[in-house]
């Protein structure tokens, strides 16, 4: 046991070294006597815990590291250990690590800037499905600076559509994109029957092909819910067309079918915050805040697997007089959250400043007994809020954009 603890401490010190060391000295560190004595397997255990940005500085130090960082097995091993960040895009891209208080900022890709505003994004494995207000669609890895434009069957922008990204099975060899019209905008179509038949578009990145089919849906995704990609499938908060029940709706990319999962553990109210996120990689989490009392409840599910019933468990509740109101006004962006390794809520939200003319974008770390920290990311004028969500939970990763040649759409 003492030997095991010694190895753990050594790995931790090496991670710290590779995270902080500057590029001109990386090759010297790799060739040092101490490093040369380490088994390559131990090096791999160290490197899969190093932040993505630091790994990219290591990438060109030698061919062996380049081969390792391009190895699919290592890429997903590293991804499984990456901590959640929050990404925001406006004129600039901001990637925030709230736990350590770090924020990196850089410009959007040049070709993004001529496509108009990003209407929405859906993260999956560090890849971002980007939907532009002009109708263009792209898959983007900000860390690797890779973009792939998606040729659209119908390039016209459809703000009433829902989007998703996932993959077929556990191999992750076949990422797919989903698009369908949300029934909340087509109530006249199901007024009599309770169901509607939208076109469902699926694009497979591997084969570079679209397919379209129609399916009868007796539910619709609630407004403000942009969807969550988890373990290859998509999840939304949805409502039955003819029943008051609110539930979790999923889309299975392997079977290419919609599957209802379970009811929400809270009463749904459009004036309250009800936000979906991931928990520990393969569980769902739900943040609920009552606008009337400001009380926050955090719920999590058991492991999400096909064919297994989903059970909700309350992780904790927070009732404090100094709790922030995560959505004080309807015209503010919707908050986004995740749960860190210490079971604290990390939430990004907008708050109106005392002058009533400006808005601060704040990140809170909230535990069961305290508000751990508050950091202001930026400010902007109060008014029409774009995008409609405060940010996105993001995992900086080495996952390459499939067939990542930059093929600009016509």
From Swiss-Prot:
Coiled coil: none annotated. PANTHER family: BNACNNG10540D PROTEIN, F-BOX PROTEIN CPR30-LIKE. Pfam families: F-box, FBA_1. This is F-box/WD-40 repeat-containing protein 1. The keyword Cytoplasm does not apply. It comes from Arabidopsis thaliana (Mouse-ear cress). WD repeats lie at residues 109-150, 269-309. Keywords: Repeat, WD repeat. Residues 32-79 form the F-box domain. CDD domains: F-box_AtFBW1-like. The keyword Repeat applies.
């Amino acid at each position: 046991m003492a030997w095991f603890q010694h190895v753990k401490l050594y790995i931790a010190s090496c991670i710290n070294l590779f995270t902080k060391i500057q590029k001109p000295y990386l090759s010297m560190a790799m060739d040092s006597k101490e490093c040369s004595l380490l088994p390559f397997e131990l090096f791999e255990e160290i490197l899969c815990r190093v932040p993505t940005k630091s790994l990219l500085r290591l990438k060109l130090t030698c061919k062996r590291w380049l081969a390792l960082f391009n190895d699919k097995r290592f890429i997903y091993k590293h991804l499984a250990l990456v901590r959640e960040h929050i990404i925001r895009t406006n004129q600039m891209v901001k990637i925030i690590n709230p736990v350590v208080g770090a924020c990196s900022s850089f410009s959007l890709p040049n070709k993004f800037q001529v496509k108009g505003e990003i209407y929405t994004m859906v993260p999956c494995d560090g890849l971002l499905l980007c939907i532009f207000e002009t109708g263009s669609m792209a898959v983007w890895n900000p860390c690797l600076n890779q973009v792939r434009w998606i040729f659209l069957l119908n390039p016209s922008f459809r703000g009433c559509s829902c989007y998703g990204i996932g993959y077929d099975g556990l191999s992750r060899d076949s990422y797919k994109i989903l698009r369908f019209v949300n029934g909340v905008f087509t109530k006249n179509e199901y007024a009599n029957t309770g169901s509607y038949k939208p076109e469902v578009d699926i694009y497979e990145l591997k084969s570079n092909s679209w397919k379209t089919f129609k399916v009868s849906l007796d539910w619709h995704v609630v407004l403000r819910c942009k969807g969550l990609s988890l373990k290859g499938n998509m999840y939304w908060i949805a409502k039955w067309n003819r029943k008051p029940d609110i539930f979790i709706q999923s889309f299975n990319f392997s079977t290419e079918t919609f599957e209802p999962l379970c009811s929400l553990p809270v009463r749904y109210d459009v004036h309250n915050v009800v936000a979906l996120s991931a928990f520990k990689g393969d569980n769902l989490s739900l943040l609920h805040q009552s606008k009337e009392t400001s009380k926050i409840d955090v719920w999590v599910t058991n492991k999400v697997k096909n064919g297994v019933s989903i059970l909700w468990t309350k992780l904790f509740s927070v009732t404090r007089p100094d709790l922030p109101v995560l959505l004080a006004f309807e015209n503010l962006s919707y908050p986004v959250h995740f749960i860190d390794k210490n079971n604290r809520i990390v939430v990004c939200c907008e708050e109106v400043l005392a002058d009533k003319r400006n808005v601060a974008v704040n990140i809170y770390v909230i535990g069961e007994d305290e508000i751990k920290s508050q950091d202001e990311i930026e400010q902007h004028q109060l008014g029409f809020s774009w995008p409609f969500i405060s940010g996105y939970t993001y995992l900086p990763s080495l996952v390459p954009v499939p067939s990542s040649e930059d093929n600009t759409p016509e």
